[in-house]
Amino acid sequence: MRPLCMTYWWLGLLATVGAATGPEADVEGTEDGSQREYIYLNRYKRAGESPDKCTYTFIVPQQRVTGAICVNSKEPEVHLENRVHKQELELLNNELLKQKRQIETLQQLVEVDGGIVSEVKLLRKESRNMNSRVTQLYMQLLHEIIRKRDNALELSQLENRILNQTADMLQLASKYKDLEHKFQHLAMLAHNQSEVIAQLEEHCQRVPAARPMPQPPPAAPPRVYQPPTYNRIINQISTNEIQSDQNLKVLPPSLPTMPALTSLPSSTDKPSGPWRDCLQALEDGHSTSSIYLVKPENTNRLMQVWCDQRHDPGGWTVIQRRLDGSVNFFRNWETYKQGFGNIDGEYWLGLENIYWLTNQGNYKLLVTMEDWSGRKVFAEYASFRLEPESEYYKLRLGRYHGNAGDSFTWHNGKQFTTLDRDHDVYTGNCAHYQKGGWWYNACAHSNLNGVWYRGGHYRSRYQDGVYWAEFRGGSYSLKKVVMMIRPNPNTFH
């Protein structure tokens, strides 16, 4: 049954192919051509009978030839299978070639990727080396920065130590000079006392025995300035360095009056003080510029001051003087507070003394200056006073007038600064740069307590001379400077 069905299927297939192509169609391949020739030659022949298989003859209508066609069912099936196998082989070959090409492409990619991977590994290695080198350089830079900071700190410490040593040396030199002055004053005092004793002895010999010797005025200066009595007063009220240094210098001016003990009209004698200030001494008849004993109101503090009675209109109390550079003004806070120097030469009266003087009334300030060519100028301020030490002696100034230019108002309202007390508005200590004590701002338009340089123009790392910026500038050290105060009843602020 199955062979018969297969035979029908193949015959139908051949009939369809033959109807589609026709007898005039081109024959492709040798096997198809021989098959068609066999059909045409034997179309009227019967196939040989075989004892195993049965054959059938179908008559398929043709366009030109009519009749039955006998087809061998074996041979077309074999040819078709061969064609199918060839197509499959070709497909397999093509697939193999395609896969071979893909494999070659993959091998090339693998080779390229392998090179890239090796390059990436090399770059990573170089990157690690570079990072390590950068880290080393960074650490070296940090060590260098730290070393420089340490060196800068050590240098700053050395500079501070040098400054302190210099200040100590200058203080020792100043103390040595003060001791020399003390010795000279003591020698002068001993000589003067010897002369006074001799004069008294001579006077006693001239006075008759029956006539009582007239008594000297009760407030005579020798009684005030004798060392025992004066030392007791000073020990009670003050230990001012200036007072202890200069207490022996007031006696010589009074020596000429000592022989006149026989003059009886005591009502004409001048009061010997102490006075409230130099103006009161002038009003009491003391018109000579000299050292006077002053006791401000509201305090028991006695102080010796230089009174300038010649500068019009007189009555000026000198609080600072610079004239020859004999005194070092680069001092600490306590020294500036108590005062230092020589009252008849370069000296600073003392912040505490200035405070008590200026707070007993309205005072004005006069600053006289002279350069090295002899030119003299002045600056006057209508009011001048200091706050107490709790306010670090803050400066209070009034209105300016004069011909020197205003270089002090910029310091108004500022606290006093020394090398060991920094109260200025600058980030550092202005006293270290200006080499003095002053009411520094940031830092100074005037520096009258600076270094006294000879000749005017000076060379220094900082502007540390005795200068008034509006008069000759900050790089010019003035020859003479005097700061003095006087009561001003018509004070206006």
UniProtKB/Swiss-Prot annotation:
This is Angiopoietin-related protein 2. The keyword Transferase does not apply. Disulfide bonds join 278-307, 430-443. Residues 1-19 form the signal peptide. InterPro entries: FIB_ANG-like, Fibrinogen-like_C, Fibrinogen_a/b/g_C_1, Fibrinogen_a/b/g_C_dom, Fibrinogen_CS. It comes from Mus musculus (Mouse). It is found in: Secreted. Keywords: Coiled coil, Disulfide bond, Glycoprotein, Secreted, Signal. The lineage of its organism: Eukaryota, Metazoa, Chordata, Craniata, Vertebrata.
